[in-house]
């Protein structure tokens, strides 16, 4: 009996200590969020779509419009793409869409099927006065949206430039670890991510050309836009969304794909490359360029990619 009482006492004390630690972290996080509020000022224009605010960033005044579409879970699409689009804005009009749940856009707890996502992207561009046709530049998971865009509204898409973009085949046997993803969301919501060294240091911060001020802004956004409810809904729908695109017709537009070494994708290099090769081989005149870097290719090889994009468009 004494041993049992001692065990219960130890368990009670342990839980109490844990609760105190979590409370301290939570309060600290709230204080930091308040201090960082001044950094969370939209870098572009905010438009309203169906009662929700969506962030749209534009730069440059070229005849052709490049629309950058971020990968799943990228906290700050604008700053993530900046190293690359700053190399292109002298020649083209640059647009970055920050979907709901990302960057400076609203967080919503709504279904994220492919039609909803695409309709919101198109409506946001219309609200911002941006007209097509567009050269879509999707990273990772946004490759699915870009392909669907070209399938459904071919007159609006003149080309696709995939920045290590995902293709439908990649999600056929994709196993979602929703408990882990939701645990990450919980950890960020209560502030645990703040005490994990280096977790806010994105590829854009580590390898891109962001200024110290922009890095500071990125970190502030990270703690507000990591594993948001909207992102979780998006992940839950990705297999269905990919299947819809896979069942559609192949886009009849020029496609250039930049392919990474697979690091950071969840697949090994051989698997990841095979997915992309299988897809591009079906596209008439499609081209793939291999890069020996990890998944966020635009943060590593921005100079090389910018050069190839200019050659491709010309």
Predicted regions and their residues:
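Conserved HGGG/HGGXW glycine-rich cap/lid loop of the alpha/beta-hydrolase fold
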Residues: 55-104
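Conserved serine/cysteine hydrolase catalytic core
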Residues: 210-284
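Residue in the alpha/beta-hydrolase core beta-strand immediately N-terminal to the catalytic nucleophile
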Residues: 134-135, 159-161
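Catalytic histidine-centered segment of alpha/beta-hydrolase-like enzymes
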Residues: 290-302
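Flexible "cap/lid" loop of the alpha/beta hydrolase fold
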Residues: 161-189
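Active-site loop/oxyanion-hole signature of alpha/beta-hydrolase fold enzymes
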Residues: 96-137
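Gly/Ala-rich beta-loop-alpha elbow adjacent to hydrolase catalytic centers
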Residues: 138-142, 146
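Alpha/beta-hydrolase fold catalytic core
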Residues: 2-66, 90-92, 314
């Amino acid at each position: 009996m004494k041993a049992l009482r001692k065990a219960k006492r130890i368990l009670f004390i342990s839980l109490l200590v844990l609760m105190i630690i979590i409370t301290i972290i939570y309060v600290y996080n709230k204080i930091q969020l308040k201090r960082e509020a001044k950094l969370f000022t939209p870098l572009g224009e905010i438009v309203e779509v169906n009662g929700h605010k969506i962030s749209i960033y534009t730069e440059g005044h070229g005849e052709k419009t490049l629309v950058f579409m971020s990968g799943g879970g990228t906290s700050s699409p604008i700053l993530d793409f900046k190293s690359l689009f700053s190399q292109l804005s002298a020649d083209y009009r640059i647009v970055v869409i920050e979907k709901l749940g990302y960057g400076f856009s609203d967080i919503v707890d709504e279904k994220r099927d492919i039609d909803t996502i695409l309709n919101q992207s198109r409506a946001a561009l219309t609200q911002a006065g941006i007209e097509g046709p567009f050269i879509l530049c999707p990273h990772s998971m946004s490759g699915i949206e870009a392909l669907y865009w070209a399938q459904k509204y071919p007159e609006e898409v003149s080309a696709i430039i995939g920045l290590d973009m995902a293709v439908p085949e990649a999600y056929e046997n994709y196993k979602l670890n929703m408990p882990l993803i939701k645990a990450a969301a919980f950890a960020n919501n209560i502030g645990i991510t703040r005490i994990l060294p280096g977790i806010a240091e994105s590829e854009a911060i580590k390898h891109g050309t962001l200024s110290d001020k922009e890095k500071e802004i990125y970190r502030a956004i990270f703690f507000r836009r990591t594993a948001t409810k909207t992102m979780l809904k998006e992940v839950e729908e990705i297999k269905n969304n990919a299947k819809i695109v896979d069942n559609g017709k192949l886009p009849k537009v020029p496609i250039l794909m930049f392919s990474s070494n697979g690091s950071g994708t969840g697949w090994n290099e051989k698997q990841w490359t095979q997915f992309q090769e299988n897809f591009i081989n079906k596209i008439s005149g499609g081209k793939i360029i291999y890069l020996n870097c990890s998944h966020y290719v635009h943060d590593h090889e921005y100079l090389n990619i910018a050069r190839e994009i200019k050659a491709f468009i010309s």
